[in-house]
């Protein structure tokens, strides 16, 4: 079972927007050393929308090769084209990914039936474990619990990243699906509470900069040690909030640059973190002990 703290890994870039393979390797080592339980390569935090297909697969391949089976690698292969999602999912399987994460199609706003058929088609086309990803605040496409329930009956659809931050919604999903269907948080601030309801982990932005703390948080929550998990979460809350001072992954890439783990590259239409946000994010990092 894929569970625990799963980092939504950024994709490091140089100042011209080219992929920085040395920094990628450094980040993967950082997570292997700091207790991250799984790596999500080229999800939406990894700027999947602005990588071409060749770059997308090369990042996944390099992460898979470096991890070498020590922890699961989940490949982000979702998008708003069903055909392209099939292509990416098939390629991710070929380079050795353990599972794929598929965001709901953005912009084109499919109906619930369209969502069902989209994900069913990908699952039938590629025999690899697949995790649904619902983040309506970014996609303007909300996959309702009844649609999740229908999709959960497809053998290789194994779980969902529920990133609404709505615990009532998460509870409804948990109530509708079988016990072996994995429900993950995609919202760092509410992840502890979702796991205490029965969720199996957190696909995390904060884990990029505080992997050990997020791993400890997830382990405590999944053991049912609510007081310990909540105490860690309270300590991390300033960071959870500061990492969304601007659109993700702008703040988290700046934070990693500040920590000396990567350069200062990001791709348009995203831009580097605004100067007015530097000190608030720096202060949050210091509060949480990730920056001296």
Swiss-Prot record:
What broad class of enzyme is this? lyase
Q: Which domain of life is it from?
A: Bacteria
Write out the catalytic residues in the record.
133, 161
List where in the cell it is found: Cytoplasm
Give the matching SMART domains: DHDPS
Q: Where is this site: Part of a proton relay during catalysis?
A: 44, 107
Coiled coil regions in record: none
State the family named in the UniProt similarity comment for this chain. Belongs to the DapA family.
Q: How does it assemble?
A: Homodimer.
Put simply, this protein is called 4-hydroxy-tetrahydrodipicolinate synthase
| Organism this protein belongs to | Ectopseudomonas mendocina (strain ymp) (Pseudomonas mendocina)
* Lineage per the UniProt record: Bacteria, Pseudomonadati, Pseudomonadota, Gammaproteobacteria, Pseudomonadales
What is the gene called?
Answer: dapA
